[in-house]
Amino acid sequence: MITFENIQQLEKYTLMTMHGLFNQLKLGIISIDNAEHLLFTPYMMETLSSLGVKPDIIDLIHKRTELEDFAAFNLSIDDTVTVCLQRSEELLKQYKSVEFNDKILINWRVIQK
């Protein structure tokens, strides 16, 4: 479970996670499907929106859905990923003062198949 003290921490964490995923996509380390399983789903968009996460962040998650369209037509995703990386960096700069003062990741659980 991940616990946040306020919405700003959640927004910063989401942006940091997105930035990392976009960077890994750009480097070819993970697949589009893998990134989707981690964060980029309609469920995550709805959940984050219901918690009051800023629309700019929700829009960036939605933008990732375009990558599937590119992949379906065997087109390069590099330009879109670069734009998403830049946008996530711009948004992250707004959260410089947001700190994580306590451990946020607690109650680890691994489910083995």
List the model feature ranges, each with a label.
Residues 1-113:
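Acidic, Ser/Pro/Thr-rich low-complexity regulatory regions
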